[in-house]
Structure formats: structure tokens, C-alpha cells
Curated annotation (Swiss-Prot):
A GO BP annotation: L-alanine catabolic process
Taxonomic lineage: Eukaryota, Metazoa, Chordata, Craniata, Vertebrata
Cofactor(s), by name: pyridoxal 5'-phosphate
Pathway: Amino-acid degradation; L-alanine degradation via transaminase pathway; pyruvate from L-alanine: step 1/1
Keywords attached to this entry: Aminotransferase, Pyridoxal phosphate, Transferase
Enzyme Commission number(s): 2.6.1.2
Subunit structure comment from the entry: Homodimer.
Homology family: Belongs to the class-I pyridoxal-phosphate-dependent aminotransferase family. Alanine aminotransferase subfamily.
Listed name of the protein: Alanine aminotransferase 2
Species for this entry: Xenopus tropicalis
Role this protein plays: Catalyzes the reversible transamination between alanine and 2-oxoglutarate to form pyruvate and glutamate.
Length: 524
């Protein structure tokens, strides 16, 4: 048998074990529980923590973005380093939105301020512009012991929360933002999970239901599984550039109320993995729907700087909410999220982010503050970087021209790569790619022949997982199967980032297109 095929099957077997199943398909909790009891009877071992005794919700958690495809990609990289011959010379990881890992250069101003915050002796270095030094000094002044190595307040450094509030006010045309409603966090993911923890309760038919878009970012399904909440799917309209349809929301909510208590509506705008940008009208409709149905709104807006398509504009849910008047602005409960990891910054490793809460019950807000206090505080270097992002150089300051040139170059390149991705993928008869209006991903639909579907099913794989694993083994291109994000039954997709350098992206897209044609011919 082909060694690469053996390796990929080993990875798939490993993933079954990782998700609580033996190679024969027997639940490991059942098998290992018997083994543990038998060993206990023999007096040799008595494990307290087994798959049978552990939290069952954890075994339900899945996160496709770092699933079996990525495990195999890492193995292939090691094999290439060891001189193993492959039909490709490198593995291209187009599976995750990590801009710097894909070669994007850091924004100079952000790194200069961060460098001085980390090593204040650099304040004496003449290579650093004065506005950089002033920004770093202001941040350090707000830190305990004037060091970002100190803990901060659990909600985040007050000066930085004030700067975040001012940023939101500028973004939203002067609508007031209260720093006391701002919670800094370890990336946006941390605050999203924190908010879900507050919202989820109940048992049986009273269990909290959370409406999430399908396709979705797997953080949501993973968090809901861990919290034992009910995932309530509403499907985006692929035929209409992945638009959100209020009628579909209503259908989903009506069905969910038969078996759970839906309380939360999650929106991702711009979309991940689907790359759509919602219109203002759509956002207004969603807010009205949430008000009518008494739903808590969660607006994931981490890609708010990533809008490329002509005619598309980012509208924050908060801005639209307040412009709709007191009927909505004084009643609809909203939490919105932003991050240092996306946008033009791409500073994933700093783990910076924030959440703003609107119309939250003061007593619940006290509980939220208590909950975040348990984890002491978000990483202070991430807080410092967030401050520089929301409080960038102003016209006339020494760093302004370079900062704007670098920012515009990054966003301009992303816009061009979004256009290229759609154009090249749509040249293949079996691939259909909607316009990448925003964010960092395309989510093309692929035709998979019936023969390949049956082979995949025989191996216990989703058909698009089968396709993506073959793609990786034969081309070195690592993308994520659409089944990991959710999709309508009978359709197949994959998610890929548009982050690789332009030349590498062109090559990747051409190779992907050629592979799909070859794959289709082989299995037809």
C-alpha cells in the first residue's frame, strides 16, 4: 500500500482516538472503562480519570481548523525536512487566518511601541520616533510598577479601555461608548466564550439554545458543546453571496423552540468562513428580529477592517442599533467583539481583544466582572498592542505616513488576492466561488464524484475531508473541509485563506484547480 495513504489513514485513526473512538469504532469510554475496572480488580491500577469518567462534554468538542488535515500537514513538513521524496517541495498551510505565519510583515509602529513597552531602555534609542516613545511611556505609566510584566485590572488597563471607547466613538460617528462597558480579553475568542458561559443555563427543554450561522467558525460549535448548550443552526444563502435571510432565522428559531430555550443570536460580520459583508438593511432586520423574539445579540466583528468588494461597507451592530432609535437602543442586549489578530494587523500571537456590552443588567455585569477576575487579567502585552491599534498615529505625527502606507499596502494586497481567488477558482467547471467581499477566506463549493463519495463513506470520512486529504498528499496544499464548518446536506466545500503572498497564492490556486480536474477524472 502507498506509504502516504498509510500515513493519512493513520492520521485519521489518530483523530478517531482523539475524539473518543477506538480503531474498531467502539467508544473508547466503554472500552477503557472496562479495562480500568479489570486492572483495578487485579490490583495493578485504578485510574480516576478515564474517558468514561471525564467530562463528556469535552469529548464532543471539535475544532476543524486544527484537525486531522493539519496534523498530517505537520507530518509532511517533517518528512520533507528528512529528505523524503514528495510530488511537492513545500507544504502551504492555507488552513488558518494567521497573517504573519504566511509572510505578512508586521506594522512598524505597532512593533516599535511594543518593543519599548517590553524593554523600556529602548526609550533612549534615537532610532525610535518621538510619537512611538510617547505612546509607550503612556502605556507603561498605566501599568503596575510601570512594567507590562505586572498584572492589570481584570477588566483591563483603564487607560486602554478609555482608548478603546474613543476608538468605538470615532468608528461609529460619535455614538457614545462607556469604558466601563469595555472588557479587554485574550483575543476575541476568550470574551466570546465568557459571554456564552453567562448566557447558557437550563436542562432538558429549558437548555439554552444559541443560533449560529452555518457555515460557522468552529469556535462556536466547540464552545456550545463544552457548555452543554443547544446549537441551533441557521443557514446562510449560498446562492445570494452567503447573505443572511430573516425567514431562515425565523424557521430555525421556530423549530428550536420545540426542544430548547433559544436565547442568543450570533452573527459573524464580515463572515468567517464565507467572506460576506452584511448590508445595513440586513443588520437592521436582524436587530428588529432580535427585539421581537427577545434574543441576546452577539456580534463577532473581528474582520471589520477587512472589506474589499466595491459597494460593501462595514456597519457595526452598535452603530446601527443606536441609529434605529430608543425603541431598540435602550432595549436590545448586545455584546460585540474585536481582536488584534485580524484586520491589517494580523498580530495573532499577542492575543489581544475586547468586548463591549450594551444594555446589560447591572447585576449580571457584576457577575461578568467576577467571572473575568477568576483568570486575573488578559495578557498585558496584548492589551498594550490593542491600545496602539485603537490609538494609531495622527496626521502630522512622525510615524503617520509610514503607518498609513503600510496599512494601506496590506489591505490593498488582500483586496487583490480576494479578487484573484474568486477569478481563478471560478475557471474550474467543478468549483464555484462566491465573491470574497471581506474577511480572509474563500469558501468555494466543489463537485465530488459519486465514486469518491462512496469511497469516503466506506473509510468513515466526510467526502470533502477525503478530497482535502488527497489534495494535501498530492500537492502539499492544506485547506479545511467544509464539513468542519457546517454546510447544507449534499453540498461540499473547503475553506482556504487568501493570506499567502500573491505569487504563491496564484500558484496554489492553479495547482488546486488542476488537482480538482484530475480528481474528478479519476473518480468519475
Amino acid at each position: 500500500m502507498d506509504s502516504d495513504l498509510i500515513s493519512s489513514r493513520c492520521v485519521w485513526a489518530t483523530w478517531n482516538v482523539y475524539n473518543g473512538r477506538s480503531l474498531s469504532g467502539t467508544p473508547l469510554a466503554e472500552r477503557d472503562g472496562k479495562v480500568a475496572r479489570k486492572m483495578s480488580e487485579n490490583g495493578t491500577c485504578n485510574r480516576i480519570l478515564t474517558l468514561e469518567s471525564m467530562n463528556p462534554c469535552i469529548q464532543k468538542v471539535e475544532y476543524a481548523v486544527r484537525g486531522p488535515i493539519v496534523i498530517r500537514a505537520v507530518e509532511l513538513e517533517k518528512e520533507l525536512q528528512q529528505g523524503v521524496k514528495k510530488p511537492f517541495t513545500e507544504v502551504i498551510k492555507a488552513n488558518i487566518g494567521d497573517a504573519h505565519a504566511m509572510g505578512q510583515k508586521p506594522i512598524t509602529f505597532l512593533r516599535q511601541v511594543s518593543a519599548i513597552c517590553l524593554y523600556p531602555e529602548l526609550m533612549n534609542d534615537n532610532k525610535f520616533p518621538e510619537d512611538v516613545k510617547q505612546k509607550a511611556a503612556r502605556i507603561l505609566q498605566a501599568c503596575g510598577g510601570h512594567s507590562i510584566g505586572a498584572y492589570s485590572a481584570s477588566q483591563g488597563i483603564e487607560v486602554i479601555r478609555q482608548d478603546v471607547a474613543k476608538y468605538i466613538e470615532r468608528r461609529d460617528g460619535g455614538i457614545q461608548s462607556d469604558p466601563n462597558n469595555i472588557y479587554l480579553s485574550t483575543g476575541a475568542s476568550d470574551s466570546i466564550v465568557t459571554m456564552l458561559k453567562l448566557l447558557v443555563s437550563g436542562q432538558g427543554k429549558s437548555r439554552t439554545g444559541v443560533l449560529i450561522p452555518i457555515p460557522q467558525y468552529p469556535l462556536y460549535s466547540a464552545a456550545l458543546a463544552e457548555l452543554n448548550a443547544v446549537q441551533v443552526n441557521y443557514y446562510l444563502d449560498e446562492e445570494n453571496c452567503w447573505a443572511l435571510d430573516i425567514n431562515e432565522l425565523r424557521r430555525s428559531l421556530t423549530e428550536a423552540r420545540k426542544h430548547c430555550d433559544p436565547k442568543v443570536l450570533c452573527i459573524i460580520n464580515p463572515g468567517n468562513p464565507t467572506g460576506q459583508v452584511q448590508s445595513r438593511k440586513c443588520i437592521e432586520d436582524v436587530i428588529r428580529f432580535a427585539a421581537e423574539e427577545n434574543l441576546f445579540l452577539m456580534a463577532d466583528e473581528v474582520y471589520q477592517d477587512n472589506v474589499y468588494a466595491k459597494g460593501c461597507t462595514f456597519h457595526s451592530f452598535k452603530k446601527v442599533l443606536f441609529e434605529m432609535g430608543p425603541k431598540y437602543s435602550e432595549t436590545v442586549e448586545l455584546a460585540s467583539f474585536h481582536s488584534t489578530s485580524k484586520g491589517y494587523m494580523g498580530e495573532c500571537g499577542f492575543r489581544g481583544g475586547y468586548m463591549e456590552v450594551i444594555n446589560m443588567d447591572p447585576a449580571v455585569k457584576q457577575q461578568l466582572t467576577k467571572l473575568v477576575s477568576v483568570r486575573l487579567c488578559p495578557p498585558v502585552p496584548g492589551q498594550a498592542l490593542l491600545d496602539v491599534i485603537v490609538n494609531p498615529p495622527k496626521p502630522g505625527e512622525p510615524s503617520y505616513k509610514q503607518f498609513m502606507a503600510e496599512k494601506q499596502a496590506v489591505l490593498g494586497n488582500l483586496a487583490e488576492k480576494a479578487r484573484l481567488t474568486e477569478e481563478i477558482l471560478n475557471q474550474s467547471p467543478g468549483i464555484r466561488c462566491n465573491p470574497v467581499q471581506g474577511a480572509m477566506y474563500s469558501f468555494p463549493r466543489i463537485h465530488i464524484p459519486e465514486k469518491a463519495i462512496k469511497l469516503a463513506q466506506a473509510e468513515g470520512q466526510a467526502p470533502d475531508m477525503f478530497f482535502c486529504m488527497k489534495l494535501l498528499e498530492e500537492t502539499g496544499i492544506c485547506v479545511v473541509p467544509g464539513s468542519g464548518f457546517g454546510q447544507r446536506e449534499g453540498t461540499h466545500h473547503f475553506r482556504m485563506t487568501i493570506l499567502p503572498p500573491t505569487d504563491k497564492l496564484k500558484s496554489l490556486l492553479e495547482r488546486l484547480k488542476d488537482f480538482h480536474q484530475k480528481f474528478t477524472e479519476e473518480y468519475s
